[in-house]
Amino acid sequence: MRKPTALIILDGFGLREETYGNAVAQAKKPNFDGYWNKFPHTTLTACGEAVGLPEGQMGNSEVGHLNIGAGRIVYQSLTRVNVAIREGEFDKNETFQSAIKSVKEKGTALHLFGLLSDGGVHSHMNHMFALLRLAAKEGVEKVYIHAFLDGRDVGPKTAQSYIDATNEVMKETGVGQFATISGRYYSMDRDKRWDRVEKCYRAMVNGEGPTYKSAEECVEDSYANGIYDEFVLPSVIVNEDNTPVATINDDDAVIFYNFRPDRAIQIARVFTNEDFREFDRGEKVPHIPEFVCMTHFSETVDGYVAFKPMNLDNTLGEVVAQAGLKQLRIAETEKYPHVTFFFSGGREAEFPGEERILINSPKVATYDLKPEMSIYEVTDALVNEIENDKHDVIILNFANCDMVGHSGMMEPTIKAVEATDECLGKVVEAILAKDGVALITADHGNADEELTSEGEPMTAHTTNPVPFIVTKNDVELREGGILGDIAPTMLTLLGVEQPKEMTGKTIIK
């Protein structure tokens, strides 16, 4: 008889003391409450930096399953760069250092370009400020900024505040000048509208386009003509004698500080592809030996990468497979990619000894119409698998609290919680009957907050903690755990050694 170790993820099941608008608290859930009272339990943080997101940002299913399966904090790009700056690793980055060394040796210029805002979707201006401070520290004299104005991830007329903030940092560091200004409509096209990108390229390389004495003047003039941040024409900042402050020339270096690839690829290709054919770049095609991209943009961009992709080796699924154990991943359609692709660290293929069961989600317009979704079918299939002694490790996702929770409707969400509790009982009893152990948790909150304080539907995820129960009375659990600690805890229970790549810490004392 196999003694299964099962991870039961109650998707969207957060914990909050306040009962108002809280479907989790208002639902009748004798099984969950019984396990909470009977077995060792604690709560885990499932949002913000604990899961690799910016501080205070709610978690989501993709990030949650990625962290749980990886057994470590998987930093998203924005947070990864923020942490590198905070911990002093940013300045030591070899790719940045190589670009700086190149321009110092050749007496050439360093150009910084990217989206100038604090939107945090494609870029963050703090990353550019860190580059200005690094250039100043390393004694780079010629530093030029090619600012892409936002107006989309932030307010439509906010550019001036970001220009002011940049001026402050340039004043503080003694380095940097604005060279070109352009709305993201031109510089960050992703739909192969190359005529837009060409305008931006010609401003940066040839100094072609409307000219202004300052970035402020450019923005003021655009506003006067009814053109706001996103759509500002690629413009050139000029000196008193009307010559461009800077153009991009041979042997200059570029650091493109956008971290999200999709809208960075086209403009990067113009500068890095020797055989670029989308438009005629003209006589002057600067040779840039050091073109640095903040993250990996695309195979089509021939640049250096400052923050290389994180390879998630030795995820829980891989370690379990290497130990020769049989594992099952089971969910209904809505959460199937989460227990497979995301849980395996972005890997589609199954590991040796891995089996997958997909139960179709019901075909309804919205899940509040059928709060139980396909949970009974998922449960029946799983209980059958457990009774047949087929698997050592089980990864199960119950989707209801999240998918129905997104409706912001109390009654259906309470029903979803109650159906989840009923099926949780069936699964846990089947596991205990085999002398197995269940770990009951969630990837983030949702059903725990269905109404705003004004009584409006609250459809988003929450930042509340999630439960963690181990159905085994001879263990003690510590406080302060995170989702990345679950896999190490499972390995402890399985008696399998934790690999060094898994930096999470077991929750068992």
UniProtKB/Swiss-Prot annotation:
Catalytic activity, as annotated: (2R)-2-phosphoglycerate = (2R)-3-phosphoglycerate
Molecular function terms from GO: manganese ion binding; phosphoglycerate mutase activity
Swiss-Prot/TrEMBL cofactor(s): Mn(2+)
Binding site for Mn(2+) 2: 11, 61, 443-444
GO biological process, one term: glycolytic process
Protein's pathway: Carbohydrate degradation; glycolysis; pyruvate from D-glyceraldehyde 3-phosphate: step 3/5
Name of the protein this chain belongs to: 2,3-bisphosphoglycerate-independent phosphoglycerate mutase
Source species: Bacillus thuringiensis (strain Al Hakam)
Phylogenetic lineage: Bacteria, Bacillati, Bacillota, Bacilli, Bacillales
